[in-house]
Amino acid sequence: MKKFRSLLLCAAAAATLSAQSEDKVEKITSIDIYVSPFYSAKEGKPEYVHVYEPIDDLLMKNDVPSLKKAIKIIEDAPDMVAPTTLMTVAARAYDLGLKDDAVFWFYAGKYRFISFASVIDVSGAMFMETVEANSAFMHLAGDVINPYAFCDIDKQQIIVEKAVDWVKGHPYKAIFSDKFPSMASDRKAALKEVIEKLKADQQKQKQYFADPKNRADYIAERKKYRTDERFCD
């Protein structure tokens, strides 16, 4: 539980250590990140997107209707959509003001990658770029999306549950590809075990915040770091 609490406090304090005066708080309204060679955005606008050819141009258009078209393409055929694509969609959604959608697609991408990396042996050189890119997205985009997500703890829990259910309901087909070595003799069973662990972690979070003291302490920590002022609408 100590480790879990530490992770939550990191989410409360994320992105608060930039050089700012104590009196002036910068509102974080965009996810300005660079993850070569997949994605770059500055001041809320994409500089380039190279994650999934069917939607790259739509994401570059930088408007809500185009983003929704991109999401529809993913929803219609999600089986081989890479986690980096889902987290890029999350970044675009955040920049365009669809922040709850951003939370969902970020967690969906994060959990899809976790499921992949838990079943497939990603320690080899062939996965170096994949691991680095996903780690970068989870860290850089997460430093913005997580603090926003916890503006409403109850809503965050609902979205996390939906994201886990989405990953369970849409197994990433790459997990079952013979091209990729697995640490498990039964990949379906291994994937099921990963999903069960994600659900168990989700339940631990619910139990943690069901304790009024834990919730109050967490809210106080966010207030200390002025996280709500930076991230909440």
Describe the role of every protein-language-model region.
Residues 2-10:
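Sec-dependent signal peptide recognition
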Residues 10-19:
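Hydrophobic h-region of N-terminal signal peptides that target proteins for export
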Residues 21-80, 112, 130-233:
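N-terminal alpha-helical interaction modules that lie
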Residues 55, 89-91:
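Conserved small-residue packing positions in alpha-helical repeats and bundles
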Residues 59, 94-95:
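Hydrophobic/aromatic side-chain positions at a characteristic register within alpha-helices
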Residues 99-115:
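TPR/TPR-like (Sel1-like) alpha-helical repeat modules
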Residues 119-130:
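Acidic, Ser/Thr-rich low-complexity linear motifs
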